[in-house]
A protein has these predicted regions:
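Macrodomain-like recognition of ADP-ribose-binding/processing modules
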Residues: 1-101
Length: 101
């Protein structure tokens, strides 16, 4: 499995490079969320977002994902949380929602 870490700030990318230089399966890219998704690198991959326990995707990486993949993605995340955990996703738990792209 290949892991891609990304950040738009060059100094942050340099720090990530230093921390992961011995890890063969980690790639650091200096790019914004939009640039990363538009590059096609994520075509067959998965995106992990820490999000929040209610599935509200209105800012940060979640906001970018909702803007790119639509409000239906947010609805699927919320539905997964409710179906599997009730009104709130417990700390440490996760749900999987397809982007349909």
């Amino acid at each position: 499995m290949q892991t891609i870490l990304f950040h738009p700030d060059a100094a942050a990318c340099e720090a990530l490079e230093r921390m992961t230089q011995r890890l063969d399966d980690v790639t650091v890219l200096c790019a914004s969320c939009e640039e990363l998704f538009e590059s096609g690198l994520m075509a067959d991959g998965a995106v992990v977002s820490s999000g929040n326990g209610f599935g509200i995707m209105d800012g940060g990486l979640d906001g970018v994902l909702r803007a790119l993949y639509g409000e239906r993605l947010e609805a699927r995340v919320k539905r997964q949380i409710i179906e599997h955990y009730g009104p709130e996703l417990p700390v440490g738990a996760a749900v999987v929602a397809r982007s349909e792209h």
